Amino acid sequence: MVKREKTIVILHDIRSMENVGSIFRTADAAGVSKIYLTGYTPAPVDRFGRKNAKLTKASLGAEDSVSWASEADIFSLI
C-alpha cells in the first residue's frame, strides 16, 4: 500500500468568490485534504450560515467535498 502525504492549500486575501470556488473545484480533483481561508478570502458559508451563491456556483459542490476552515491570521498556520 502506498502512503500518501496530506496536501493542504492556504488561500490568503483572495477577493473573488468565483476564483475561490474554482480553487475548491481544482482542489477536490487533486485530492487536497484541507483548504484554509485566511485574511478577507470569502468562505463557502457566511457568518449567518448561508451559502455564498457565487462561490457555490463556481465550485460545483466541491465545497462540500473538501474540508475547509477560516482562520483570521495566516501566521498561525505557517
Regions found by a protein language model. Name each.
Residues 2-78:
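RNA substrate-binding interface of SAM-dependent RNA methyltransferases
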